[in-house]
């Protein structure tokens, strides 16, 4: 009979194994694993928050600070869903959404508008340019993931 070794007395864990334990890879059963999500917002805080939440769920995250930067990245990265702030410099969220929805390649890509405003006019304007949903900032993890579940068939 082999003695049971107390893990505390065993050799130290391999550094690579420690890294994997600290940063687990999402399982294949994870509905968000490998999903490509784009977050367009001029607020570094919003971009980082969304990126952190989404990466923990297994998503691949692409970020942009405004619509101009986003358009090139959308063409290159082909995201599964796009979150876009309505108020940004150079090319705002409404204009960005309209350009995405008028493009034959990306018109079926879900676009979720992000705003600190919760007015009926802002929501209606988002719908007019083709957005699929409207989230008010600050959003919760559940709201962010719920939007993905609703619009992307995982």
Regions flagged by a language model, labelled:
Residues 1-26:
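C-terminal catalytic ATP-binding subdomain
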Residues 48-56, 124:
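Charged docking surfaces used in two-component/phosphorelay signaling
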Residues 58-65, 73:
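Short hydrophobic/Thr-rich beta-strand motif most characteristic of the beta2 strand and flanking loop
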Residues 77-83:
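Active-site beta3 strand of CheY-like receiver
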Residues 88:
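Receiver (REC) domain active-site loop signature in two-component systems and cognate sites
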Residues 139-148:
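C-terminal output helix
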């Amino acid at each position: 009979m082999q003695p049971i070794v107390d893990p505390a007395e065993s050799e130290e864990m391999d550094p690579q194994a420690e890294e994997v334990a600290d940063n687990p890879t999402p399982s294949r059963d994870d509905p968000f694993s490998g999903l490509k999500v784009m977050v367009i917002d001029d607020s570094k805080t919003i971009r980082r928050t969304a990126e952190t939440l989404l990466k923990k769920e297994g998503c691949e995250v692409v970020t942009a600070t405004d619509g101009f930067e986003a358009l090139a990245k959308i063409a290159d990265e082909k995201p599964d869903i796009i979150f876009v702030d309505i108020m940004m410099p150079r090319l705002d969220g409404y204009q960005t959404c309209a350009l995405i929805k008028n493009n034959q390649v990306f018109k079926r890509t879900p676009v979720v508008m992000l705003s600190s405003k919760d007015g009926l006019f802002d929501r209606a304007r988002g719908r007019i340019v083709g957005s699929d949903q409207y989230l008010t900032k600050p959003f919760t993890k559940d709201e962010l993931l719920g939007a993905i579940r609703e619009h992307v068939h995982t």
